[in-house]
Curated annotation (Swiss-Prot):
It is found in: Cytoplasm. This is Acetate kinase. Mg(2+). Can also accept Mn(2+). It is an enzyme of class 2 (transferase). Homodimer. The keyword Phosphoprotein does not apply. Its cofactor is Mg(2+); Mn(2+). It holds the Pfam family Acetate_kinase. One of its GO terms (cellular component) is cytoplasm. Coiled coil: none annotated. SUPFAM superfamilies: Actin-like ATPase domain. GO terms for molecular function: acetate kinase activity; ATP binding; magnesium ion binding.
Amino acid sequence: MALALVLNSGSSSIKFQLVNPENSAIDEPYVSGLVEQIGEPNGRIVLKIEGEKYTLETPIADHSEGLNLAFDLMDQHNCGPSQLEITAVGHRVVHGGILFSAPELITDEIVEMIRDLIPLAPLHNPANVDGIDVARKILPDVPHVAVFDTGFFHSLPPAAALYAINKDVAAEHGIRRYGFHGTSHEFVSKRVVEILEKPTEDINTITFHLGNGASMAAVQGGRAVDTSMGMTPLAGLVMGTRSGDIDPGIVFHLSRTAGMSIDEIDNLLNKKSGVKGLSGVNDFRELREMIDNNDQDAWSAYNIYIHQLRRYLGSYMVALGRVDTIVFTAGVGENAQFVREDALAGLEMYGIEIDPERNALPNDGPRLISTDASKVKVFVIPTNEELAIARYAVKFA
């Protein structure tokens, strides 16, 4: 069985999967795992092999040790690189800037180009590079492929991609809308076309990727024409801990009147805002319980969250001119039926009508949740970014 190894390397963790690229979107990966608490004394590796879970708790000094320990654990259970045919390694890279519009075969030169983009993604790209460096040393004889979160949005028209600031400053510092979650938005927009069995160019779709991080995209005939995240993943929708869109003047106000540093404001907007900043929690199951108990902070957070979803929905309906499908995906989008219901409530005049019974069904693969009479077909489609990355990677094998 030919498999692709998919790596998502974070600052203190590595998520990985061994994926059969021929799988369907809802098939479980052959192996999945998580290396966490890298650099901490309480490091842990969790491995899931065909439904069975195995755990190793040990200090993990760095990414190199973490990935080597994970491979050793896989070898112990007869599913390591030495026992299986790994044909390619796909790496999720958060920011490709304007340099990368498609997956790239990784070379030393490509690694340096990704490293040069660290100022655009200081929280993500350094860890992505660490994962690439480690994996290339452990598996030097298979192709390694970088798949960029931003790549799908290279098709944005200038009116959607550029900010109205001094063009020379923007050009010098790479300031523009890049968009994120691109692999997910592309995956589900392609899936809905497959489900409908229609030509890609005939379908206009609005995609909701709603997890702890959240974004939306307008996809016209297979090409992204707008998206909610911007130069960074902080922009756009209200998220679990991120503020989403705010008046930029708030940054100056906090600096001048509260004496907050840039790093403190960065931390506030990225980690202490959003639904958590408003309600104290960022888990939508907890938020729902608080709403059911009539917690006013939870109600306020939820209403602001839904308001922002509907603002972007209306904007993208205008941008596309004609909407054929709407797709919800990711943790909240796939599982929170109340979010889907409230995001699309009262839009029957625009041809959008949710079927309450279909919407209430459990998350079990792609499904239609709109009524038969709805002109716009609304779907829940589980995303599978790892499968998408695996399919890209094996093309270079």
